[in-house]
Amino acid sequence: MSRVCELTGKGPMTGNNVSHANNKTKRRFLPNLSDVTLGSDLLDRRFKFRISNAALRTVDHRGGLDAFMAKAKDDELSTRALKIKKEIVKAQAAQA
């Protein structure tokens, strides 16, 4: 299972642990990922995602999965999330 957020593309970063004596040792900063189930109001379905907690807060802030996907950039989304976004866009067009 990869350590990359499916909605924002946030992944591991590298850096240093720095001691009091200023000794540096390499380390990895991993994203805080959670397995969550998000529901789409337009599609009336639920989807399981592995997303960062920051992305979960953003989804809540934007008003749900449908609103988040409408504003999300295609290059940040995973292939599965991109397919879901296209389904949501089709449903919005059919509803309008």
Swiss-Prot record:
Q: Which InterPro entries match?
A: Ribosomal_bL28, Ribosomal_bL28/bL31-like_sf, Ribosomal_bL28_bact-type, Ribosomal_bL28_sf
Q: Which UniProt keywords apply?
A: Ribonucleoprotein, Ribosomal protein
What does the sequence similarity comment in the record state about its family?
Answer: Belongs to the bacterial ribosomal protein bL28 family.
What protein is this chain from?
Answer: Large ribosomal subunit protein bL28
Which classification does the entry list for the species?
A: Bacteria, Pseudomonadati, Pseudomonadota, Alphaproteobacteria, Rhodobacterales
Q: Where is this region: Disordered?
A: 1-21
| Gene Ontology cellular component list | cytosolic large ribosomal subunit
Q: Its Gene Ontology biological processes? A: translation
